[in-house]
Amino acid sequence: MSSNLEFKIQNFKSGEYQCLADLNIYDSPSCERLATQAATGRHLWVTSNYQDVETRGGEPARMTAFPTHQATGGASVQVCLCEDDYPGWLSLSDFSLLQPCTVPYKAKTFSESEIKKRLPEVIAFTQKAMQQSNYYLWGGTVGPNYDCSGLMQAAFASVGIRIPRDAYQQEAFSQPIAITELQPGDLVFFGFQKATHVGLYLANGCYIHSSGKDKGRNGIAIDSLSEQEDEISQSYYQQLRGAGRVVKSYEPQRR
């Protein structure tokens, strides 16, 4: 580890920070696979639930006040995103892109009618994203490349509404509705044992989503809830499990 990075670690305190740039958040301390992303301006907590002692030659060398992990080629710290309570690992090399929060994150509240008024903008966000060159990115929540639930989260966040991160979490968070009750801006969920994919309903049986390379369109596209369309639409339709309506904005459980 460089002396500059060591200095950052030694002087970095646990607490709430704001992102000065778009940041990658990983699913393990090794920072090899993307879990999610934190857009510029988002808040995160550097967690502090235990102390980590590094040793050199069998003797304690330094004690850090928050969970860190030494991985091949770098180091990481455990974090939790404030807006959706999503946990992950941040590379210590990105510490310079954080600033301490002077004002803690406070979730906004919206009535169901206020959310309904914003749905045309939510839909417009996804359609604009589709017009840009993009591909499916596992863990992607920052344009131009998204995963399915990341696109949904970003679209609602664009109008100030927060929803959970993953498809199964979004399903549990939304108000269940029948497929026959679908309206523009509702969420449609796919998967067998649990929701593993999500899209945004448009109209006339069509929905917009970001799907993968192997079994999808490798990016954002519009498909139909029908067995009469192409193979990809049919494949997802066979996994259709339900629909949900966003009637509130997520409020973090962490205090």
Which residues are covered by each model-predicted region?
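Short, basic/aromatic beta-hairpin or loop at an interaction surface
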Residues: Q10-I25, A154-Q169, A203
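Aromatic- and glycine-rich peptidoglycan recognition patches
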Residues: G15-N24, A35, L202-R255
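Short, conserved secondary-structure segments in the cores of folded domains
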Residues: R33-L34, A178
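SH3/SH3-like beta-barrel superfamily modules
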Residues: L34-F95
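Surface-exposed beta-loop interaction hotspot
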Residues: L97-Y135, T141
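Catalytic cysteine-centered active-site loop
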Residues: N134-P184
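...with weaker cross-activation on analogous glycine-rich loops/strands in unrelated enzymes
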Residues: R162-Q228
